[in-house]
């Protein structure tokens, strides 16, 4: 075993520290005597909190500075939420392990404990995600969507203070924080697709660091990997980022991998969905096929309009 101190690059939010702390604890349990420490890196997404993500522009808003630290060798690995990781990684970096996925669904959290169907006419829903906003508008065209940025505890506090009637969050974040009791209702992916990679954690490292890759190998979950690979293949096909309402969810049941994908217009008036199933060995092809079906069915026009805006 290595004598190195393994430095994990992480964002500084409570949730990010919980996720990276879980990886640290798992590595230390697997490799007794291994020294692992967390190193907080502030990202662009952490610094700009008063602008919707779609208007900030660019890709990798929550990972770029951590990847820069990896390439500069000031950290040895990085723990990311896979939904934040761009479809194409920087040269010299790879995802070394993807542990077992948490619940990938979105959830509604309301002040009254009532679900989305019971919100008042013109109710105010907080989210900074175009994907979530588009799908909510499809379900409830009367709803007012208001920008909501900040970490998970800030979002919950703003809801409690009355700034919103409801907010939409990732189930995985609430679960990892032990705050399942805050969930009002889970949004079924059959009606409301999550973000690409949502609920999955990716551990990124330098391609030339075989020592760290070996340490991470026992943390890797093959079933989660093939599901996320299919979703990310869809994302690459659509060339999407934070600026576009794209959703995707893949799951493996009895040896069959099924992927559903979605592209919506900003106003939610147009929403295209497609799905394919096949062998896990075809994960990338399934992602490409779903992406091409979406593009050919009308999503290409929507994406071109968004990119021109």
Curated annotation (Swiss-Prot):
InterPro entries: HemC (IPR000860), Porphobilin_deaminase_cofac_BS (IPR022419), Porphobilin_deaminase_N (IPR022417), Porphobilinogen_deaminase_C (IPR022418), Porphobilinogen_deaminase_C_sf (IPR036803). The keyword Transferase applies. Pathway: Porphyrin-containing compound metabolism; protoporphyrin-IX biosynthesis; coproporphyrinogen-III from 5-aminolevulinate: step 2/4. Its EC number is 2.5.1.61. GO terms for molecular function: hydroxymethylbilane synthase activity. The modification S-(dipyrrolylmethanemethyl)cysteine is found at residue 242. Keywords: Porphyrin biosynthesis, Transferase. It holds the Pfam family Porphobil_deam. This is Porphobilinogen deaminase. Tetrapolymerization of the monopyrrole PBG into the hydroxymethylbilane pre-uroporphyrinogen in several discrete steps. The porphobilinogen subunits are added to the dipyrromethane group. Belongs to the HMBS family. GO terms for cellular component: cytoplasm. Its cofactor is dipyrromethane. It comes from Syntrophobacter fumaroxidans (strain DSM 10017 / MPOB). Binds 1 dipyrromethane group covalently. It catalyses: 4 porphobilinogen + H2O = hydroxymethylbilane + 4 NH4(+). NCBIfam families: hemC (TIGR00212). Monomer. Coiled coil: none annotated. GO terms for biological process: protoporphyrinogen IX biosynthetic process. The keyword Magnesium does not apply. The gene is hemC.
């Amino acid at each position: 075993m290595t004598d190195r101190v393994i430095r994990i690059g992480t964002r500084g939010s409570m949730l990010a520290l919980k996720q990276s702390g879980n990886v640290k604890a798992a590595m230390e349990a697997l490799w007794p005597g291994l020294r692992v420490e967390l190193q907080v890196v502030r990202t662009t997404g952490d610094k700009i909190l008063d602008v919707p993500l779609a208007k900030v522009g660019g890709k990798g808003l929550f990972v770029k500075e951590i990847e820069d630290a990896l390439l500069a060798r000031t950290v040895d690995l990085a723990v990311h939420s896979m939904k934040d990781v761009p479809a194409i990684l920087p040269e010299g970096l790879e995802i070394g392990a993807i542990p077992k996925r948490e619940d990938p669904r979105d959830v509604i959290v309301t002040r009254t404990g009532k679900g989305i169907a019971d919100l008042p006419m013109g109710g105010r829903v907080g989210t900074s995600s175009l994907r979530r906003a588009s799908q909510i508008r499809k379900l409830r065209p009367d709803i007012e969507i208001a920008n909501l940025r900040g970490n998970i505890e800030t979002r919950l506090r703003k809801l409690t203070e009355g700034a919103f009637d409801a907010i939409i969050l990732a189930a995985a974040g609430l679960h990892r924080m032990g705050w399942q009791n805050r969930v009002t209702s889970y949004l079924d992916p059959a009606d409301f697709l999550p973000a690409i990679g949502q609920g999955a954690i990716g551990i990124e490292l330098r391609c030339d660091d075989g020592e760290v890759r070996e340490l991470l190998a026992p943390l890797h979950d093959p079933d989660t990997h093939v599901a996320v690979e299919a979703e990310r293949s869809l994302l690459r096909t659509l060339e999407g980022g934070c600026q576009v309402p794209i959703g995707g969810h893949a799951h493996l049941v009895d040896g069959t991998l099924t992927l559903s994908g979605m592209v919506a217009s900003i106003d939610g008036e147009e929403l295209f969905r497609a799905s394919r199933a096949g062998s896990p060995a075809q994960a990338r092809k399934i992602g490409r096929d779903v992406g091409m079906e979406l593009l050919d069915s009308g999503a290409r026009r929507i994406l071109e309009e968004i990119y021109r805006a």
